[in-house]
From Swiss-Prot:
Is thought to be an important plant defense-related product against fungal pathogens. This is Glucan endo-1,3-beta-glucosidase, basic isoform 3. The active site is at residues 85, 230. Glycans are attached at residue 318. It comes from Solanum tuberosum (Potato).
Length: 328
């Protein structure tokens, strides 16, 4: 409840050489603050609006007019994320039948607005959709969600848009510390941990990412790229959540983002969650994902100013996430 103003946040992005941002909802205060900033944006269409948008093109046209066209080209919107972590196996299952119709309607509305070559339409998913992730080459979607994931992958393939994926080695490690080592989760393993044919894995992030690539390939989406739309590590509030672990993970993720994974070498567009600690979030660990304190002081000694790297940040009405892409 004590976060900086929208204009202060955008100024912080610019001062830290942060070149992209994710907004989880079309907050007009944030969008107005972004005008003329040259910061590229992932603009979220919230879950609560997905059913409405799916119900008719007139709703999609209105949403695009009010939240995209009214700010374009002053705000450089790069992607629209239609929903976040909608899944048949979570509390969002009631929205699953509306996911693809909403994607299609927003895609058509963006095309009608003359922005089809500028803005890609996608959705953000989490790892609960993956049934098998080990070894990474055997990655596959859960059989009971294929009816949901296959049409999404097909839509992204046909429209040449990437899948947005939230990847958190922290949760895999904290949920199974007996099987997953901390160094493997923090990018600090001294040796190969997983040998998968000719591919070698020294960190869990790559293994998780490549399992999603394999899953998409198995469903006809071998040409679909991935943007890591969230990743981070909490500094307090739960098992393994310490200041040192968070600093190590973030520092190594920043460095690793320019390298790519064994399956897909090259820069990985990766968004760090979150920009600020937030005292109103629950459970406790959700309060401690920030790169910065609400007073804009950095929690970690992270280098945002390397000339060949552009940092991205994403923001909610109440929270911010930061993302990195390198070798621009």
């Amino acid at each position: 409840n004590n976060l900086p103003s929208h204009s202060e946040v955008i100024q912080l992005y610019k001062s830290r050489n942060i070149g992209r941002l994710r907004l989880y909802d079309p907050n007009h205060g944030a969008l107005n603050a972004l005008r003329g900033s040259n910061i590229e944006v992932i603009l979220g269409l919230p879950n609560v609006d997905v059913k409405h948008i799916a119900s008719g093109m007139e709703h999609a046209r209105w949403w695009v007019q009010k939240n995209v066209k009214d700010f374009w080209p002053d705000v450089k919107i790069k992607y629209i994320a239609v929903g976040n972590e909608i899944s048949p196996v979570t509390g969002t299952s009631s929205l699953t039948s509306f996911q693809v119709p909403a994607l299609v309607n927003i895609y058509k509305a963006i095309g009608e607005a003359g922005l089809g070559n500028d803005i890609k339409v996608s959705t953000s998913v989490d790892m609960t959709l993956i049934g098998n992730s080990y070894p990474p080459s055997q990655g596959s979607f859960r059989n009971d969600v294929r009816w949901f994931t296959d049409p999404i992958v097909g839509f992204l393939r046909d429209t040449r848009a990437p899948l947005l994926v939230n990847i958190y080695p922290y949760f895999s490690y904290s949920g199974n510390p007996g099987q997953i080592s901390l160094p493997y989760a923090l990018f600090t393993a001294p040796n190969v941990v997983v040998q998968d044919g000719s591919r070698q894995y020294r960190n869990l992030f790559d293994a998780m990412l490549d399992s999603v690539y394999a899953a998409m390939e198995r469903t006809g989406g071998g040409s679909v790229g991935i943007v890591v739309s969230e990743s981070g590590w909490p500094s307090a509030g739960a098992f393994g959540a310490t200041q040192d672990n968070a600093a190590t993970y973030l520092r190594n993720l920043i460095q690793h983002a320019k390298e790519g994974s064994p399956r897909k070498p090259g820069p990985i567009e990766t968004y760090i969650f979150a920009m600020f600690d937030e005292n109103n979030k629950n459970p406790e660990l959700e309060k401690h994902f920030g790169l910065f304190s609400p007073n804009k002081q950095p929690k970690y000694n992270l280098n945002f100013g390397v000339s060949e790297r552009v940092w991205d940040i994403s923001a909610e009405t109440n929270s911010t996430t930061s993302s990195l892409i390198s070798e621009m």
